[in-house]
Amino acid sequence: MSQKGIKSLTISIASPEQILNWSKGEITKPETINYKSLKPEPNGLFDESIFGPSKDYECYCGKYRKVKHKGKICERCHVEITESIVRRERMGHIELAAPVAHIWFTKELPSPSKISLLLDITYKEVDQVVYFVNYIVLDEGNNVYDGKSIFNKKEVLDLTSPKNSIRSRNKLRRTLRNIQERIEDELNHEREALIQDFDYRLAVTYDQMLKDSNIPFSVKDVMAFIEKHTGVRFGIGAEAIRELLEKLNLEEEHEKIKQAIQNSPNAYDQKTKRLLRRLECVRWIKDSGSKPEWMVMTRIPVTPSETRPIISLDGGRFTTSDTNNFYRKIIIRNERLKQMQATDAPEILLDNEKRLLQEAVDSLFDNNSRKKPVVGKDKRPLKSLSNHLKGKQGLFRQNLLGKRVDYSGRSVIVVGPELKMYEVGIPALMILKLFRPYIISELIRKRDELGNEIQPICANIKLAEQKILAQDNEIWPVVEKVIKQRPVILNRAPTLHRLGIQAFEPKMVDGKAIRLHPLVTTAFNADFDGDQMAVHIPLSKEAVAEARSILLASWHILGPKDGKPIITPTQDMILGIYYLTKEKFPQVIEEMMAKDPTQARVEFINNFHIFSTQDEAIRAYKLKTIRINDVIGITTKAFNNKTFSKEGILVTTVGKIIFNQAFPVNFPYINDVKNLYGENQFEIIGMHESILDYLKAYNLKEPLTKKTLSTVIDYLYKVSEIEVVPQTMDKIKALGFKYSMISATSISAFDIPSYDQKYEYFKETDELVSKLREFYLDGKLTDDERYTKVVQAWSQTKDKVTHDIEKLINSNEYKDNPIVIMAKSGARGNTSNFTQLAGMRGLMSKSYNYDQKNNNGVIKDTIEIPIKHSFIEGLSVSEYFNSSFGARKGMTDTAMKTAKSGYMTRKLVDSTQAVVIKDHDCGTKEGIIVREIRNTKDNTSIESLKDRIVGRYSINTIYDTKNKLIIESDKLITSEIANIIQNSGIREVEVRSPLHCASLYGVCQKCFGLDLSTNKLIETGTAIGVIAAQSIGEPGTQLTMRTFHTGGVAGDTNITQGFERIKQLFDCIQPQENEKAVISQVKGTVERIEKDSNTNGYNVVIKYNKDNYVNYPTRSNAVLRVKTGDEIIAGQKITEGSIDVNDLLKYAGIENVRHYIIKEVQKVYRMQGIEISDKYIEVIISQLTNKITITNPGDSGLFVGETISINEFTEVAQNMLVNKKKPPSAINQVFGLDHAPSKSGSFLSAASFQDTKKILTDAAARSQKDMLIGLKENVILGNLIPAGTGLKDVEEVIAYGEEMYKKQY
């Protein structure tokens, strides 16, 4: 422990002495509480003398009551006078009458259990011995036949199974005959003497009885007899296992196994694998300081009584924790066994009782591992201690990683357009509840801020509470004062990324709904159709400072996943801004335009108003001299602080003047978005230019849409101080709402364009479909080919319809159509909606089991009869039925996808949670070579070179093609430099990457580069692992579930796409045979490609190393990627499809694997229009590929098969070389997301992910020490996390919070 909490945590196997040390007393009675007095029974499971008093400072018998007796122990009832909370931490114990094996060490599927590995007997044999089925040899004695010992030590005698019992019985009979022969020799074969010898007669009798397989007597007698004569000792039960473990010499065993591994001819056979497992286990126990026999317990601990409470229900009934039932059973059986032992009961009865005791203890520790778990009255298995640890409802995930918190509430959200960006409206009722302690403290305050005495509003807490309850008028000024002291934190579930939790300054509102600022809805993914949000209150000074400086909504301008503005206005606001920035010719000219455009342009000058100031122009609009969208002129001098390309008359509209007033004074005037970047110089008529000529050629500019407005906000963020952006956004929001109201945009079914062209297309396609049907019936086409062509035909028809509709809505006729305006501005709707409303619904999907797709068949997941009608026309009955089919599939897909995507996000977070920015520069000289990602099929760009290198550090100095310096090595590549690199024709750039960062834990600032959410160098302490996982997981729900098929002929590649593809890549799942690409294992040239008549596929022959050849057969429907004469490298695709990552690692190395995964992940996301920075994918991949498996330990002390991180391996190898020792060798590994978290080196983090039991068993066996490097481990133990402000001083955090508070407007 230290000032800052726990420094590290070790887990090990508890020794009997340790258990006694924990315990405050032995429990001998199974009773819980007295049914009359409801007090705990002495010596029972709730005994107060062991676990502490039930009531604070009050003993069992009532002799001592009150805190003044604290620390005394009552002479009568032996209860210590203390607080009752000790009942949560004090433990008891049960002394077992017979040793019991710990189920975690005997049953550990799928791998062999620890006891089985230590004793080198099979898992099944351990089980049989422990459960009193079979005997085990403890000592082979001097029992020899043919020069060999009949029994081997640790040999298990199977006398129960008909198959194996013959061999064991024969061995026993052989031993009995040995005894007979020895007695015969002693008595010189005298018949009389032999008949009278009791032992001889007994040996003969036992021998005869053992002939029969159904042994009708206790074998124990035979074994006792054999032991007496030969010294061979047999044992059964946990007692026998314990004795063998006690006698185990770990040092000897270790050397023996090492020798056996060295002598093993095959390093990969099952025998060697088991030897390696044994070596690992023996070394763990040897190095841990634990003794193997501690795996078999002679006493068990009893958990504190408050952790397994007994609760009284109505009607005098009780309910209790399942744990109590287990303990009760153990105590009853244990006490019964003690009595039997005291009365010298027969061995067979004792063994039976010991087995029952073993089973009772097993069910306490792990009820579900048993074949027949102990069930309750309702026939459900009772929850054992293992169940309390694992799963979502277990201790780790339910109680340690996520807790319910006080000072919180939740309510429905409604929009609050009047709020500032950092404000939230909290209902008065909620404020009274949440801020109650602060309000009361203010009401009873006797001194003011300066320390002067004042008259309190309420004399005491009780009166203050009454005033709050009555909602007295006197409390409201106090409430207003109190809520200014601290912000509140808002959270909307599901919290898919860090912007799902933000802080706001509270503002009291009427009603019961929380009022939310409209601009933050995108970040929360909230809408106002009944969504609820939770409110939390930061209590400590540090928490308040953190909320104000880091969590406040107005600081979150850019989304962390792509660095794009996340507070872009939406819907009504967009509509208002679109209307406000729209340009029109003056009304008279507009009317003329329809009749005579040339004359209208000449007349334009007579209706062109020029103003000298902004106010004058706005006044003219208010007086209705001009309309808000009319093109007008205004002198450039009317705009102070703004720079123009020249002086003169700026051609703009009143709407644009009003819009520009929302921006800071020195911000460029936005007449068109291009103005921001100096393109298309401002529309200014210069001092000596002809106004008439200018106006004649004038074309109306496009208004601002959602997309262009986002560009404006992005630019504003780049050039302004952080506090200016939210102020400007609030002004834009207000303008948006105001002018969407003034625009009076309405919506009606008759606004939808009418369209009839489609029926001609339908006629053509129907004819084609019937032709295809005839071809199929004539046997010219297979059903698969017919289906594919039909679907393709209808898809093309819909494409034509879509194209027509697009042309229609972009035509002049519909430019003022309200629905078209909504779609064009980006407020609501898109072309696909118009196609369905005015054109046709098209083909619908149907349910299809993608997992069972056959090898060569076509995926028939589309109903081949399209829906020809549009929604405006209305659907026919059959069309409605088909469309409901697709709609339902869509709903179920979404539900499935959400769950799967959530699980993937959890796995991503668990894999990367320990990755934090640790230092400024790790000094690595390695990087990754980055090229543009292109889709090789249609040669389109998926991600440009600029997108991939911007915000990263260069490894080498970069020159353009003319040898002119662009950027030096180890310098940041800004957006401008990235543009120059891309335009100079450079195809690839080597940059720093998290994949090659040499920091021992985490990543350095330079290897990561710019923080996408601030556009500044990433700060130390940023938990980029979690941010990367969120950025990849959050859009996961937007990925499609279906497998795209490229349409066209059967045999075109059916490649898994969308979410399933991401899962395949990150979980390292082998692609199915029919979509797996054939890759080259060698570097060479394609010699020839031959058709294989047997398989209908191809044989691709590659020549390598001058005159070596290798042949790659392909499946029948494979699409080739190579042609004769092509140069080919190892790992390159020969056929289309998905590459198996493990094959790629084998033939092309880890770097190619990393590049492949980045490229494929980007392909999936970008094809869905989701932009994610490469850096995040690299952080994830670095965690999947940063482990290495030892193949030869050299002199390092590591062992074969051990998995360690690359950085650790490098350190060990360097030390070996420096000390002139033999370094270890190893191979790279790729782990999927399912296995990566358990390889993190922290058992707490791994156990809270999956396989809790196995991870804790392994960690305890090796006495593992958790150094608490990651975030989860620290959360579990209640430490501050080693990231963000957790690494800073408290004073520093508070000072920063106060500084940022001053920046609020």
Curated annotation (Swiss-Prot):
Report the source organism: Ureaplasma parvum serovar 3 (strain ATCC 700970)
Tell me one Pfam family matched here.
RNA_pol_Rpb1_5
Which of this chain's residues are annotated to bind Zn(2+) 1?
59, 61, 74, 77
Keyword annotations for this protein, in alphabetical order, are: DNA-directed RNA polymerase, Magnesium, Metal-binding, Nucleotidyltransferase, Transcription, Transferase, Zinc
What is the role of the protein in this entry?
A: DNA-dependent RNA polymerase catalyzes the transcription of DNA into RNA using the four ribonucleoside triphosphates as substrates.
> Catalytic activity annotated for this protein?
RNA(n) + a ribonucleoside 5'-triphosphate = RNA(n+1) + diphosphate
UniProt protein name: DNA-directed RNA polymerase subunit beta'
- SMART domains referenced in this protein's UniProt entry, alphabetically: RPOLA_N (SM00663)
Cofactor(s) needed: Mg(2+); Zn(2+)
Tell me the classification of the organism that encodes this protein: Bacteria, Bacillati, Mycoplasmatota, Mycoplasmoidales, Mycoplasmoidaceae
- Entry note: cofactor: Binds 1 Mg(2+) ion per subunit. Binds 2 Zn(2+) ions per subunit.
What EC number is given for this enzyme?
Answer: 2.7.7.6
What's one GO BP annotation on this UniProt entry?
DNA-templated transcription
